[in-house]
């Protein structure tokens, strides 16, 4: 009986030590800050950051149009939330905001920590929901940052040092 009690106690203690995955994008961003605390470097440009402030000089970043947004860290979905959700019924009825509020499957996909990385805010905004592809432009839009956005083609080109994204998850 004593062994059974000890076993059950150990089992209970062990299962409580594992954290649940974040259920919302807001929760995921909080967890992501702790994940990147040991290596506070932006994903696309290699800029260092402290708190939510990007050190633009650390990577030679030059703002294209939005210096205030360029100076802050934002959490980028490598596979855009639009790709994950635009075919879902909730998106048809009110876009991302509706899906975040009403669709727990979308919320979990939006909160996937494997799909979130810290980036320069301006780059996040400029990339929007554009897919990745090869572009002929030389990387100069953002100073020394090797990220390129072609707004007419609705395409972004990631630096060659950044791994390609996995296919978008299928949400049912």
Model-predicted regions and their roles:
Residues 4-12:
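Sec-dependent N-terminal signal peptides
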Residues 6, 19, 50, 83, ...:
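Residue-level marker of positions within ordered structural domains that often coincide
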Residues 10-11, 36, 111:
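Sterically constrained small-residue positions within well-ordered secondary structures
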Residues 14-16:
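N-terminal signal peptide c-region/cleavage motif recognized by signal peptidases
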Residues 20-72:
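Aromatic-lined ligand-binding clefts that engage carbohydrates, nucleic acids, or primary amines
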Residues 61-74, 78-172:
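Domain-level detector of nuclease and nuclease-like folds
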């Amino acid at each position: 009986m004593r062994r059974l009690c000890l076993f059950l106690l150990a089992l209970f203690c062990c299962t409580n030590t594992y954290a649940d995955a974040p259920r919302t994008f807001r929760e995921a961003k909080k967890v992501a800050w702790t994940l990147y605390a040991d290596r506070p470097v932006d994903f696309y440009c290699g800029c260092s950051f402290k708190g939510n402030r990007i050190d633009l000089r650390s990577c030679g970043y030059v703002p294209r149009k939005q210096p205030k947004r360029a100076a802050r860290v934002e959490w980028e979905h490598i596979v855009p939330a639009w790709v994950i959700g635009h075919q879902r019924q909730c998106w048809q009825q009110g876009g991302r905001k509706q899906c975040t509020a009403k669709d727990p499957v979308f919320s979990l996909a939006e909160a996937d920590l494997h799909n979130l990385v810290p980036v320069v805010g301006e780059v996040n905004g400029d990339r929007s929901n554009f897919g990745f592809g090869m572009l002929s432009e030389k990387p100069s839009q953002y100073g020394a940052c090797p990220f390129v956005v072609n707004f007419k083609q609705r395409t972004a080109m990631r630096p060659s040092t950044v791994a390609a994204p996995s296919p978008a998850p299928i949400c049912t």
